[in-house]
């Protein structure tokens, strides 16, 4: 395991143990709903299903098609806020 991987695992463990990971996930869900991200992705899913036909689309197909667009559509302000929260948490709980 690389040094970077170990650090990520440690951070993830600390976020999980302290309950911060769940709080961040809830914040992310709320922010994405608030900015219309979920509605945009839902509409894109419907477009993909219409284009390919319901019988020809699997959940895996949708995930492959939607994931890149979903990542791009997350507003920078949401990304920055989450990153700020993670940094603040780590600064407060640094050992």
From Swiss-Prot:
A GO CC term attached to the entry: nuclear pore
InterPro entries per record: TF_ENY2 (IPR018783), TF_EnY2_sf (IPR038212)
Any GO MF annotation of the entry: transcription coactivator activity
Top-rank lineage group of the source organism: Eukaryota
Swiss-Prot/TrEMBL GO biological process terms: chromatin organization; mRNA export from nucleus; positive regulation of DNA-templated transcription; protein transport; transcription elongation by RNA polymerase II
Subcellular location: Nucleus, Nucleoplasm
Keywords: Activator, Chromatin regulator, mRNA transport, Nucleus, Protein transport, Transcription, Transcription regulation, Translocation, Transport
Keyword NADP: no
Xref: Gene3D superfamilies: 1.10.246.140
PANTHER family reported in the protein's UniProt record: ENHANCER OF YELLOW 2 TRANSCRIPTION FACTOR (PTHR12514)
Function: Involved in mRNA export coupled transcription activation by association with both the TREX-2 and the SAGA complexes. The transcription regulatory histone acetylation (HAT) complex SAGA is a multiprotein complex that activates transcription by remodeling chromatin and mediating histone acetylation and deubiquitination. Within the SAGA complex, participates in a subcomplex that specifically deubiquitinates histones. The SAGA complex is recruited to specific gene promoters by activators, where it is required for transcription.
Oligomer and partners: Component of the nuclear pore complex (NPC)-associated TREX-2 complex (transcription and export complex 2). Component of the SAGA transcription coactivator-HAT complex. Within the SAGA complex, participates in a subcomplex of SAGA called the DUB module (deubiquitination module).
Family: Belongs to the ENY2 family.
Record-linked HAMAP family: ENY2_Sus1 (MF_03046)
Protein name: Transcription and mRNA export factor ENY2-2
Lineage of source species: Eukaryota, Metazoa, Chordata, Craniata, Vertebrata
